[in-house]
Each structure stands twice: as structure tokens, then as C-alpha cells.
Amino acid sequence: MYLHNYQQSKNKETYLLIFLFLFSLLVRIPAIFIFGDTDLENEWRNLVNNLTNHGTLSLINFGDFYVPNFFMPPLYAFYLYFFKVFNFSNEIYILVVLFSQSILSSFSVVIFYIINKLFFSNKISIFGTLIFSLFPLHIYACGQISSVTLQSFLIVVFFYFFFTTVKKDNFFNICFLSLTSGLLILLRGEFIAFFILSILYIALFLKMNLKSIVIIILLTIVVISPYLIRNIMLVDTMTITKSIGYNLWKGNNPNSTVEGNAHFDLNLREQINKVPKNKHYDINVDKVFLDEGLKNIKNNPTKYLGLYLKKIFSFIFIDINSSNPNYYHPLHYLPVLFIGITSIIGIILSNKNSYQMNFLILFFIANVTIVSVFFILPRYSLAIIPLQIIFSNIILEYIKNNFFKI
């Protein structure tokens, strides 16, 4: 009888997971055709075209010289390039990319449900998962040529394997945690800081076996090592990207808003024009931006501290002065604002004795405070929305436990 009931329960959960995936995918497919991009643009076009036509990952060129790319993290460029090798027509190529992103997004919904089950009842977990599935920004992002959907997927996968590895640090879990960590580092440079934070948290609070921690670190290095080796061979520099200077300057110059400002003044343009046009170009240009950004902050710390706090507010809640023409559509700003408010309440109500929940809170705080040093674009919110939904679910759990059963 017990085995029969257990099997029935497992079957129901399997059907639920299949439903969540198919439902999420069906919701996203129309968005591809209604809101989806129709071509590669800007940096993605340059990177993919140079990979396709010249066999080099390069963002800019001077005549026949293609500058090795250090400005953009490589993973999403190679993701786009992967589909390019099938020689689809441009229209089909874009649709295949967007459809693949919709599949990843739908898988992230399934994994998100499993993560929620670690903290909440089944009903609350389903409710929170449906919110994540139907969140307008989450659906809209699938139709954009942007790394944000891949980032959201990998972050959810990272949390899943983080918790499963803490629970059972076998080689399978360790491998997938390391793989996900490495891919996130190759996708977003700032994830190096989050990875270090996660390792320290595992070591100090979760008391994981030292051997397992060392293996996680080593395997993560193995994942990123091909690109590290490429950079060392090209410019004798151990780095993934060199864009911290540009990002700091863009978010901290006299014309900067929450979204940053990339307008060059004459002095800065002259400095950039003097940079030698060689394989170190990206690195040296970034140094120019870094010096300029630090100088701006040093000369007017009060102004940029205020802007920093404004960016934090905009990241968690909404930007009250966005330049994006669609930002204030009710289907965008109302859910973002609401989930921002409820997530803060949820953090306040959270169980401070839960090492798992405390890790998510710490990760959230680190994400917001680090990214806000630079600039905040509307799509960046998708990286923290899974956490905000989990924190918001705490309110439902609190109501259930203190007022009535859900």
C-alpha cells in the first residue's frame, strides 16, 4: 500500500512537471512572433559575424585587423554562433534562437518549482511557480536577442544544484554545480564574485567537506579554462572580460542615469583615439574608462552615492525615470513593483535560522549591491525575480501558518 501511494505521488509530480513545462512553452511561443526580435543587432551581430566570417571572437576591427574580444563575456556569443553553423536563413535562424530560449525558460520554470518545494507546501510552490512562468518580463525576454534568458535559466539551475550538493555532495551533483558555475562566469563577469561568496558560505555555514569544496573550485576552473587559456595566449592576461572600467564609467559619469549613459565627451574621445590599435586595444580602452569613472566618483562622491542608492531602489522596485518607451506599460512596471515590495516583506518575515533561505537572501543582497555599482537596465530584473518570488512566497507561508491553512 505504501509503495502504491508513493508511486501515485511520484506520478502526479511527474505530470505536474510536464504540465509546467508545456504550459510555459505554449505561453512563450506567441510572444516570439508578437514581440520577438527579427535580427541580430549591435554587439551580437558583430561578434557572430566575425566568428562566422573570420573565425575570431572580435567585436571591432580596424581594417583587416580584428581586435580580440575582451569586452563581452563569450558564452552568449557562442550560443548564438552554435545555431549559425546550421546555415538557416536569417528569419529561421532568429526564430530557432528565440525558440531555444523559450525552451530554456520553460525548463527553468520546472526547476524553480523543485526549488520552491524545499521551502514551501505544494500549493504555495505551484502558485509561486505559475507566477514565475507568467511573469510578463520573463515571457517577453524569451523573444529578445539578449543573454538574460540564458542567465535566468543558469541561475535557477545553479540554485538547484547548490542545494542538492549541500544535501548530498556526490560527484554527479558537484559536476553539475561546477559546470553551471563555470558557464555563469563565462556569461556574466560579476558571477565570479557570487561564486566566491557561495563557496565561502558553503565552507563557513554549511560545513561541507573540504575535499568537495576543492573539487567544485577545480572543476569550475576546468570549465572556464579554455577561454582563460585563449586570453593568456593572446595577451598574457588571466581574465574572462575586461569591461569593468567601461561599465563603471557608463554608470558613473556626469550624464549618467540609473540606466547609465554612454555619451563620450571630447576629452574622453581623444584619450580613446590615442590608444594603440593592437591586440591589447580592449584592455587599454577599458583602463581609460576605469580611470575616468574612478575620477568622477572621487571628485563628487556625494552625487554618485545618491545615484548608487537610486540604482539599488530601481533594481529592487522600479526606475521612476526610465528612458525605455515601454517601461511604464502596466504589464511591466506593476508586477515588477509589486514583487519588489512583497519580496522585502518576505525577507523581513523569513526564518533567520534557515541556512538555505539565508543563502538566497545573501545572494540577493550581493547581486543588488554589486550590479548597482554600475548601471541598471530593465532586463536586469529578470536575474533576481526568481529570488523575489521565493521571498514573496514567505508571506503566503506566514499567512498559512498564522491564520488559516492553504
How would you label these PLM feature ranges?
Residues K12-D39, L219-M233:
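Transmembrane signal-anchor helices characteristic of membrane glycosylation enzymes that use polyprenol
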Residues F21-V27, G128-P136, Y160, S181-I185:
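Short helix- or helix-capping micro-motifs
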Residues I29, L40-P68, L75, F82-V85, ...:
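Extracytosolic helix-loop segments that constitute the early lumenal/periplasmic catalytic or substrate-binding loops
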Residues I32-I34, P68-M72, F83, Y93-I103, ...:
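Membrane-embedded glycan-lipid processing machinery
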Residues L95, F107-L134, S152-F153, F172, ...:
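Transmembrane-helix signature of polytopic, membrane-embedded enzymes
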Residues F99-F119, V157, F161, I341-I348:
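Transmembrane-helix motifs of polytopic, lipid-linked glycan transferases
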Residues F119-N122, F158-F176, L184, I202-M208, ...:
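Membrane-interface transmembrane helices that cradle and orient dolichyl/undecaprenyl
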Residues V235-K311:
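Membrane-proximal stem/loop segments at transmembrane-domain junctions that anchor or position
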